[in-house]
């Protein structure tokens, strides 16, 4: 109990980060617009901010000189409020630099975590495809899964209180509160759509930092459980700022029950508990009974509401049985299929029939959701019939084909792990015919006339590139086509879901 209380309390060693003086350092502004930084999230060019590379250094120096003035902060606040569209150059520069500065405590934690664990190569762990082999190995032995949505909405002031665990100096917290309340509303809540709306025109990196700190707070319970009960040396669970996902194996689970009167510590033994998260959705799979997994559901809701003050409706956590429901996660429909088999065993003069069931993890393409995404992008209608997209008059045929080809290849790579490729072939057909109709519309002709004139060979190159890559990896055999149709292929260089595949 004492260890848990010490973990949940403010860590004094992490508070000694005085970040406000860094606003007066010129190299911070250089780091803000350095596109070569490893792990950088912000890619906005400085030309879009209204100043070029030659004059940016001079502008920053003049800004730092004005910041040393006694009444600069008052003038800065007044200028910011007068420019509601955030067009003031000083405000934009300071907000960009502040987003980099507040990431420093989390970045230091990530570096120290990697150095302590002596992990030389951890880039492959960032591939979101690497989580599916883990699910294939673990979910086939489990019974229930909790589909969890990260609690939203959250009040702006709660974000400031959360960051007090990491930032000690009061000026940084006041500046953080100022940016939050001026970007949105002083009495508003942050929700996914609203946050993107008022941060998309400003500093999107700032929003990503706030989101990661919010998720970090929600998952602090799982971090504590893994540190106390799990010792997997081959798995890194560093800071969530640079992590795409986080999972851990827990043998003995500890849960904190928070209420208005007391805090009780209860122990649940479950050697098969696994946690996976991507963006705002996470899953908690277990081999426990339905009663135990239902207790976990209400424990999480009570923990978020009583300790972290996150209002989370019970409907945002669903309990599904793996054998009866498909798991919609990371753009795939995953399920555990049970295949019955009968084995005849003979001993002396007696023979026996043994019924065995083989559990197999399957991932398929959610064809209906993917067609809806293609329809929103104007590649087809709601029924899946390909339509032409309006093409610019100055776009060449090769540019149009290349644009369609990149979309097709990206979708083929991401859904290469599907156990059923027939749905993927339908998506390729929609993109192929939509490309042909777009070119025919540009040349003011019909698809049939256009294909007769130019032939269909120019559309086949980018649709068959993925198969050519696979032929270089795997040797050709008489059954190679059947093998490509059945094999699951996971790539270790995919760090994000394609926009068309992200239909959750």
UniProtKB/Swiss-Prot annotation:
GO terms for biological process: mRNA processing; RNA splicing; tRNA processing. InterPro entries: Domain_X, Maturase_MatK, Maturase_MatK_N. GO terms for cellular component: chloroplast. Keywords: Chloroplast, mRNA processing, Plastid, RNA-binding, tRNA processing. Transmembrane segments: none annotated. GO terms for molecular function: RNA binding. It is found in: Plastid, Chloroplast. It holds the Pfam family Intron_maturas2. Usually encoded in the trnK tRNA gene intron. Probably assists in splicing its own and other chloroplast group II introns. Belongs to the intron maturase 2 family. MatK subfamily. PANTHER family: MATURASE K. This is Maturase K. It comes from Lactoris fernandeziana.
């Amino acid at each position: 109990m004492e260890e848990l209380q010490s973990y949940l309390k403010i860590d004094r060693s992490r508070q000694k980060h005085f970040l406000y003086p860094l606003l007066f350092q010129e190299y911070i502004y250089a780091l803000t617009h350095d596109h070569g930084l490893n792990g950088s999230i912000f890619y906005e060019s400085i030309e879009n901010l209204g100043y070029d590379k030659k004059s940016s250094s001079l502008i920053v120096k003049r800004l730092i000189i004005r910041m040393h003035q006694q009444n600069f902060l008052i003038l800065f606040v007044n200028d910011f409020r007068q420019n509601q569209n955030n067009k003031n150059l000083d405000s934009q520069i300071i907000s960009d630099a502040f987003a980099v500065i507040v990431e420093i405590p989390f970045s230091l934690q990530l570096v120290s975590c990697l150095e302590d664990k002596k992990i030389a190569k951890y880039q492959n762990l960032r591939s979101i495809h690497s989580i599916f082999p883990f699910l294939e190995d673990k979910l086939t032995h489990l019974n229930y899964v909790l589909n969890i949505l990260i609690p939203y909405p959250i009040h702006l002031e709660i974000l400031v209180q959360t960051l007090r665990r990491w930032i000690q100096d009061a000026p940084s917290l006041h500046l953080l509160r100022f940016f939050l309340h001026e970007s949105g509303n002083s009495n508003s809540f942050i929700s996914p759509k609203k946050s993107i709306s008022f941060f998309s025109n400003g500093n999107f990196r700032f929003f990503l930092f706030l989101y990661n700190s919010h998720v970090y707070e929600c998952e602090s319970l799982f971090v504590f459980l893994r540190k106390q009960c799990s010792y997997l040396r081959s798995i890194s669970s560093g800071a969530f700022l640079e992590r795409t996902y986080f999972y851990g194996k827990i043998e003995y689970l500890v849960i904190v029950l928070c209420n208005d009167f007391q805090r009780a510590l209860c122990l649940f033994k479950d050697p098969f508990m696994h946690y996976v998260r991507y963006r705002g959705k996470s899953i908690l799979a277990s081999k426990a009974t339905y009663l135990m997994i239902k207790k976990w559901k209400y424990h999480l809701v009570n923990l978020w509401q009583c300790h972290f003050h996150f209002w989370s409706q019970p409907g945002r956590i669903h309990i599904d049985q793996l054998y009866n429901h498909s798991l919609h996660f990371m753009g795939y429909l995953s399920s555990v299929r049970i295949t019955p088999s009968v084995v005849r065993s003979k001993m002396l003069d007696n023979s026996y029939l043994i019924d065995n069931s083989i559990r197999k993890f399957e991932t398929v393409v959610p064809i209906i959701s993917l067609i809806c995404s293609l329809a929103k992008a104007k590649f087809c209608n709601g029924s899946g019939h390909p339509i032409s997209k309006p093409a610019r008059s100055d776009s060449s045929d090769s540019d149009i084909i290349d644009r369609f080809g990149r979309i097709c290849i990206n979708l083929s790579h991401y859904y290469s792990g599907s156990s059923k490729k027939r749905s993927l072939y339908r998506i390729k057909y929609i993109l192929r015919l939509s490309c042909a109709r777009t070119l025919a519309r540009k040349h003011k002709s019909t698809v049939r006339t256009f294909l007769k004139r130019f032939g269909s060979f120019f559309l086949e190159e980018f649709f068959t590139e993925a198969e050519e890559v696979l032929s270089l990896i795997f040797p050709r055999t008489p059954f190679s086509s059947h093998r490509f149709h059945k094999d699951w292929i996971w790539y270790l260089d995919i760090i994000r879901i394609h926009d068309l595949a992200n239909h959750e």
